[in-house]
């Protein structure tokens, strides 16, 4: 049962890292390879192919585990503000481990905000109560258009690299844990050297293992493992 597998992997990770902040953990499968297999679920890869084609590189994963009380807010942002991908094409899968409700801080998004494929201006936040330190500058003008993504355990949503999205703090008394997996078309290039400039801005490493999970690499990426053989 996949939901049991997800929970088992999460509980093991939380136990092993109980003295660390696990509300936001980047580079997840580099830290714990147990999380790599979930990115290759056939039902997920099939949906990713419909969006970015047959040649696919898995390049990142994160854990978002909001505590039952005082679970941190994720500020409104675009994922592309953080990522050294050229050309900038990527899709994120948000895989739910816990039930996601309106009360426990669901992912929210602005419909259609990705369509012009442009990065909007972001500000840097100086706060310990958020998972990320970048936020969209003029988001207050359109927040009333936001929609919430409500999920049962094992369900997943997908969003584009340019989509405006974020999530509220969790004070519901009910944990909200989920995994994100990042995929890019293998026609794009992950610029490990260029990532260092962004790292200084966001405060965490963007050095990633790249996994070819479908098709062929077309942009001379530094592939860590080829899963198509």
Per-range role (PLM):
Residues 1-85, 122, 194, 208-212:
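Non-heme Fe(II)-dependent double-stranded beta-helix
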Residues 14, 156, 162-229:
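Non-heme Fe(II)/2-oxoglutarate
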Residues 67, 101, 116, 185-187, ...:
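Feature marks short, surface-exposed loop/turn motifs that line or immediately flank catalytic pockets
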Residues 78, 131-143, 173-175, 193-201:
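Short, surface-exposed loop/helix-turn segments at secondary-structure junctions
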Residues 102-168:
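Double-stranded beta-helix
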């Amino acid at each position: 049962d996949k939901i049991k597998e997800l929970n088992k992997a999460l509980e093991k990770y939380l136990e092993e890292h109980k003295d660390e902040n696990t509300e936001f953990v980047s580079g997840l499968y580099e830290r714990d390879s147990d999380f790599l297999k979930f990115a290759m679920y056939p039902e997920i890869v099939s949906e990713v192919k419909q969006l970015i084609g047959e040649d696919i590189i898995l390049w990142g994963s994160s854990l978002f585990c909001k505590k039952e009380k005082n679970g941190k807010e994720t500020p409104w942002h675009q994922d592309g503000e953080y990522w050294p991908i050229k050309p900038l094409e990527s899709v994120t899968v948000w895989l739910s481990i816990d039930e996601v409700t309106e009360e426990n801080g669901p992912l929210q998004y602005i419909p259609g905000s990705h369509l012009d494929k442009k990065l909007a201006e972001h500000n840097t936040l100086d706060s310990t109560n958020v998972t990320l330190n970048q936020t969209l500058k003029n988001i207050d003008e359109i927040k009333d258009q936001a929609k919430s993504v409500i999920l049962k355990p094992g369900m997943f949503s997908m969003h584009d690299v340019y989509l405006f999205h974020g999530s509220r703090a969790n004070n519901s008394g009910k944990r909200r844990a989920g995994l994100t997996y990042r995929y890019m078309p293998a026609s794009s290039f992950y610029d490990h050297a260029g990532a260092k400039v962004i790292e200084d801005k966001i405060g965490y490493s963007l050095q990633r293992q790249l996994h070819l999970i479908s098709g062929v690499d077309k942009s001379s990426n530094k592939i860590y493992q080829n899963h198509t053989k």
